Amino acid sequence: MTQPEARSTLPADYESQLRESHLRPLWMANVSAVMRAEPGQPLRRAQPHMWHWREVRERLLRAGELVDVAQAERRVLILINPGHTSPDGVSADSSLFVGAQLVLPGEVTSRHRHSAAATRFVVEGSSAVTVVNGERLAMEPGDLILTPPHHWHEHVNEGTEHVIWLDMLDAPISSHLDAVYFEGSPRTPVSEQLPERQAYRAPGLVPYRSPSATPLRYPMLRYRWADVQKALEALASSADRAQAVHLMYANPETGASVLEPYGYSARLLRPSEEVAPMLTSASAVYHVVSGQGESEVGGRTFSWEQGDVIAVPSQTKVRHRNGSASRAAYLLQVDNAPLQSKLGWYREFA
């Protein structure tokens, strides 16, 4: 949908009075066109786009040579959607901050907490740990690590290899709502994983408790890729070929998303398989965990390989195809469907 050009027919002195009073005519504002947008034809800034991991990785490693982690706080390159032209535009799609972070051997990032909800998806390296509220969490490639709002966290690389992961935060949302805060703190003693979290390792089972007891709000902070891949492969081997292999990361106590306001899920594409997810009002970001293939997003075709990141704007048709005839491909999907659902905005289109 093309936004109509607003033309002023108002007297100059009246326009001046409106500006002085910090008022604006609705019929002259961009919001007027937005309110007339038709379903399936939204006015949106985000564009279909793909970040090639080989480029991101090369530039991130270069940053490791140029920037000390003590100087940078976090050595992160932000993935910015080309549709966001303002200096403060930091979204990979319409609402999700995605950044690639590098931690070199021996580095320790400063301990802090903030209002934004954050996750880390490990791309390279196995020698780092994330410490959340004093609890030590191992990080292996493909693992999803949660750092919920208001939780203290830091990262430590204890090995001899660099570690890279994707940071994913709701910072664009909290920033827009003026709900951002950040607080630093000295390091504190670190403990191993809380014993009660071990009880959540078996699917469909949670610790027995009195009906009056309150469960952990975030019972799992680390979702191991080894477990996710095993579950995807089990579904692929038993499901009908017509059924897509798609599993959601869920809070075992509630069945809801592991960390709202976003939904996290993993897809397995069978050899040569092609899938066309339902067209919805949600925007999404895909990360290629492994494999190679192509995705058609809003009429554009992106050929992808391991590590690449793809932005799918709201109400945009998408189709994925596994380019291998012998090996499965795996995709991580992060979308804002839970947020839209909470606000009553979410829609599905035939």
Locate predicted features:
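A short beta-strand-loop-beta hairpin characteristic of the jelly-roll/cupin
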Residues: 104, 108-141, 147-151, 278-306, ...
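Asparagine-centered strand-capping/turn motif at beta-strand->loop junctions
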Residues: 156-157, 321-324
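Contiguous mid-protein beta-loop-alpha structural module that forms a pocket-lining wall or clamp
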Residues: 145-201
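C-terminal structured domain segments across diverse proteins
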Residues: 253-255, 262, 278-281, 291, ...
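A short hydrophobic beta-strand segment most commonly corresponding to one strand
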Residues: 119-121, 146, 160-179, 325-347
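A short, N-terminal "cap"/entry segment at the start of jelly-roll beta-barrel domains
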Residues: 2-94, 183-184, 190-261, 265, ...
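Intrinsic, low-complexity N-terminal interaction/targeting segments
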Residues: 76, 87-90, 97, 109, ...
